[in-house]
Amino acid sequence: MSAQSLPAATPPTLKPPRIIRPRPPSRHRAPHSPGPLHNGSSPKALPQISNDASASVCTSIFWEPPTASLKPPALLPPSVSRTSLDSQTSPDSPSSTPSPSPVSRRSISPEPAPCSPVPPPKPSGSSRTPLPSGPTPLQDGSASAPGTVRRLAGKFEWGAEGKAQSSDSLERCSQGSTEVNGEKETPEAALSGNGSQENGTPDAALACPPCCPCVCHVAKPGLELRWVPVGSSEDILRIPCRASPLRASRSRINPPVISHPPVVLTSYRSTAERKLLPPLKPPKPTKVRQDISTSEELPQPDLKLPSEDGIQTATKAWEGDRPEGAPLNAPPVALEGREEEGLDGLKGLQWELPLQDEPLYQTYRAAVLSEELWGVGEDGGPSPANPGEAPTFSRLPGPRNTLWQELPAVRGSGLLESLSPQERRMQESLFEVVTSEASYLRSLRLLTDTFVLSQALRDTLTPRDHHTLFSNVQRVQSVSERFLGTLLSRVRSSPHITDLCDVVHAHAVGPFFVYVDYVRNQQYQEETYSRLMDTNVRFSAELRRLQSLPKCERLPLPSFLLLPFQRITRLRMLLQNILSQTEEGSSRQENAQKALGAVSKIIERCSAEVGRMKQTEELIRLTQRLRFHKVKALPLVSWSRRLELQGELTELGCRRGGVLFTSRPRFTPLCLLLFSDLLLITQPKSGQRLQVLDYAHRSLVQAQQVPDPSGPPTFRLSLLSNHQGRPTHRLLQAASLSDMQRWLGAFPTPGPLPCSPDTIYEDCECSQELCSEPSTPSKTEGQSLESKAPRKHLHKNPEGWLKGLPGAFPAQLVCEVTGEHERRKHLRQHQKLLEAVGPSSGTPDTPQP
């Protein structure tokens, strides 16, 4: 290899250029078809290049593009015409000659970066042509208007010509790879992306010039090359760079480029600068919220509410600051520029459109409790000092439900000035029923969508646990949706709400009974949730993940499970507030009383069902502790049975000895369990177990105090018929006098009252009567009797009237059902006879302690 083919020596501090060995041509080019040269220069001029080029910093590389890669003359830009290229073949180029970046052997990137429209060099044995090194003139010989690149706020802008050139360079970049020694080679600028990219958009105007192996274009770690077009920037129109290489279609022919301004290397820039620049994001539409104090005079749109089948509410004005330059009397931006089709589409949406800003019901309930704690009025603000003065509604910090006075239709109709303060408070109370139901429904939907319908959470539970944990909450949600839709259809009729209590009453006597079924399982819900959190690790982990979602606002799952019972109780409080503000004798008062009575019945039934379920759970736990040893087992769990009294007593007995020893007292600890219809006598054992000693029906148990002023309180407990059908007696000692009085009061002696000849029966011993003759309400004081209908009486007077469940009826119209009740009655009569005769009748004496 001759010394002339080697590049010039470089200083030690600079990286030497890469030596590319030319490859001999595969065949000799025919003299008659030399092929078009890229720059139009003659091959004879090539040997005249002196060796003075070795003294320069940049070493020229001569190349000739293959015939297949050349475009037709019609597709070549005018800036690269033969005339313009011939003018740049002089080897004495200025120092501002474009210096391409070095080449590399890396593979082509799937996302082509912008690169120079000039093809890269290809070493071959054919005639070599130097790269263009001067400004590119136009076809008419005039200098082209150079493009300009500006960096403003993290984005690049350039002229109209530069934009067209960048789009053309994107297509040529994909074809700019060269073959060196049989391998595919891609320019460094196309791979490393010397043009900086901000926010995912490449700077097409900052594309590198044609590649060259000179040391001034060597890429440095952590730095990138900065390229700036030569020329003035005053005549260039600035257009933001939004071009992306992925959007450039290869099948689409780019428009011809008028000119290609030369670029020069100015400096290196650290790649850390990109991280310091904020990303460019499209501006978000500003939500305009109207101030309450200044929006009273603003014209507001009409109230837009759905029909009965929809669940859409009134249009709610945005709250917040106005954008700069917006007039005070301008409508909200959200309604500006909307066509009629857009408004019709909004009417078809559900209630989230107007009430989407309503807080969750947990937040609403906390705000209500805070207002009640700090003395804030029920209408949303403190009561005015002067009763005739209009109340001012001050909002507590944090999310809060919408007030009636904030509705655009209310402000536009002038109702705030025409209504009295009392009527305004009534409107706020009525509208709170709607907004609170919207918040409640939003929380229910969040519970259903996030927890109930979560497949990941369902996979951690068994079907039984999943049903017990969530019960029929989806049915409760559907009832709430229908209820809210009916309320909104009433509010839609007029901004001035006439009444809503009739709607509440219609739903309370029908669909609201689904709350009873849900609240009944509340005890099982709490136990299942506690058990799963302690034993099921997968469930607890998935539940914590769901609760941490932003839409859940870090609220726990139990707060969602308690929503139905909290809502029905809050609805009763709202009805009480409405009833207190109604006028005497008005239709509002009548409807409020009916609605309040219906909702109160549901709450009472819910409370009764909750208590009954707790009692059933208590019976189940108690059954697990009982041990029937030498006693016939008894099924204890029953829907009608409940535990009324439980306590520990001490039985006094005598221990009989031999001939040399006399009898001495014996103390045995007992535990008595008194149910609604049964008495169990048990003895405590280890491990909280209870061994059953005896049991009897409650109506066959009697208790009598033993007079002993010096000793502890003692009473005698008699079972007229125990589990074996025999009478037994026990002498029991209580820990205190109050405990003894409790047990004595639990077994009252049946008979007439001291001041009345009527007979009072206990619930456990009342008889059942069967109607033998139907009667009309005139004969039965308002209670009708049907044939063969059973009745239960608790009170019997000498006139022959029986008062019980459900009312009073004459005794001659019914006949007592014989059976177990008759047998127990005869046993009691026999016991009274034995007590009247005395100890000689065979009743054992009670041993004295």
Curated annotation (Swiss-Prot):
Residues 111-123 have a biased composition (Pro residues). Residues 65-110 have a biased composition (Low complexity). PROSITE patterns: DH_2. InterPro entries: DBL_dom_sf, DH_dom, Ephexin-like, PH-like_dom_sf, PH_ephexin. Changing Y361A: Abolishes phosphorylation by EPHB2. One of its GO terms (cellular component) is glutamatergic synapse. The keyword Phosphoprotein applies. GO terms for molecular function: GTPase activator activity; guanyl-nucleotide exchange factor activity. It comes from the Eukaryota. The modification Phosphoserine is found at S107, S109. Residues 18-31 have a biased composition (Basic residues). Keywords: Cell projection, GTPase activation, Guanine-nucleotide releasing factor, Phosphoprotein, Ubl conjugation. Residues 425-609 form the DH domain. Residues 1-146, 159-202, 277-308, 771-803, 819-849 are annotated as: Disordered. Phosphorylated on tyrosine residues upon EFNA1 stimulation. EPHB2-dependent phosphorylation at Tyr-361 triggers UBE3A-mediated ubiquitination. Ubiquitinated; UBE3A-mediated ubiquitination and degradation by the proteasome promotes EFNB1-dependent synapse formation. Residues 48-59, 164-180, 771-786, 840-849 have a biased composition (Polar residues). In a mouse model of Angelman syndrome where Ube3a levels are reduced, levels of Arhgef15 are significantly increased and ubiquitination is reduced compared to wild-type litter mates. Specific GEF for RhoA activation. Does not activate RAC1 or CDC42. Regulates vascular smooth muscle contractility. Negatively regulates excitatory synapse development by suppressing the synapse-promoting activity of EPHB2. This is Rho guanine nucleotide exchange factor 15. It comes from Mus musculus (Mouse). The gene is Arhgef15.
